[in-house]
Amino acid sequence: KMMIDSVHKQNAHIMISIWASFGPQTQQYAKLKEKGLLFDFETWPQSGLSHIWPPRMDYPSGVKVYDAFSPVARQIYWDHLKKLFDYGMDAWWMDSTDPDFFNAKKEHYEQKGAMGSWRSVRNLFPLATVKGIYEKQRKASEEKRVFIMTRSAFAGQQHYGSGLWSGDVASTWDMLRKQVPAGLNYTMTGCPNFNTDIGGFFCGSYNTNGAGSAPRNKQYQELYVRWMQYGLFCPVFRSHGADAPREIYQFGKKGEPVYDAIEKTIRLRYRLLPYLYSTAWQVTSQGESYLRALHYDFASDRRTWDMADEFMFGRSILATPILNPQYTEEKIFREDAMSGWEKKELKDEKIKELNADFTEEKTVTKYLPKGADWFDFNTETLYRGGRDVTIPSALDRTAMFVKAGSILPLAPVMQYATEKQWDNLDIVIYPGCNATFLLYEDEGDNYNYERGAYSTIEMKWDNKKRTLTIDSRKGNFPGMMTNRRFNIRLAGTEDVKTVNYNGTAINVSM
């Protein structure tokens, strides 16, 4: 509890990794075994001596997966997590929700659980175990929203406070490129929450100057920055992995290109929080998605039908992440897929110590979908849609565009999400056609919003009249601001109009 409290005092949250399997020395195992609620097949870790692959089976771990389809088993599982929740644990990292299933035999598939044979229910396992934790936490308290990150999912899992991450992926450009279609394909199943390990999980082959030195390797630095810029557009923005630490100061110091690029990306993410949180409300209330394949919104543009390197982030932002190296040589990576967890990264001739100059100006060519005009977010240059454009791509520049006919709310620079109230938001209007935006706010935690404790402010841009209408605020919630300021600006101009807003509708001519 002291550890959790110390994290909270630093204005951070804490998430713990929990698994759906138990070793024979644990209380959970004993209770589950007594009631016949363990599946009898090999799962991770197989060895009781080491995680090194292949496992040493002279001392098997005996770890077994619990029957998540049984209400009794789910209660036993939660009973041993409840104490952690009472201590203040904020979130659950539910790993191996597939679950890991090694050396499968016919009899393993035919064994019976609470809902039938393992063969008939295996794909449902992540849904069942995630749902169990969600329901137990909701019953325990309505004051903290359930947040679950899980390695696997099934249809409908979005109902239970869960998001999927793409697993322990390799730290390569090829793997970064694959994250984009992976996320889009996943979210098209109706599950909107997808994220990845920024920088990839296995970065060991970049440790060319000793253990943990990858953050000082030029090849890894460039990959990490570009991966972070892609991660900016995921619902969860998260750096994680093995083999080397990932804190910003591991990559250099303030004033150096890599450090500054990472800091700039993080600060932009926090500035986008009003847009992201309002999008989250559309996801929750209207069934929308954070990550939108381009054919959702531009179906008449055939070029978007199979585009796997660009997407919409919400309704207004076109994400065009840079997915190829521009300053260093691409690491060519080959592996035996069954080589084992700890051997996913192998040294090869492409890993080098390079003296890349990250201050050099670079350019990149991106496609702008037909059916809209687009503003470069960084320069606010306006481009016609339906063509390729070449834009600057310095290391610290996240490649992104905003659709003409958009309203983008931006928060002040913050160190953490609740450091400052949103009482002084910047509102950037991207003209060219009419636009609307619904600003959503609530208490930031708990489930009172399900009972109507939230507010919305609709903003409407009339492109012909050059007027922004900020409608009357609808709804209320405890702690809601009654007075605030909006700093309004047209993209491509520097003139700012600041207005005071007390919840009553106002018109602002630009």
List each model region and its residues.
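A surface-exposed beta-strand-loop module
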Residues: 509-510
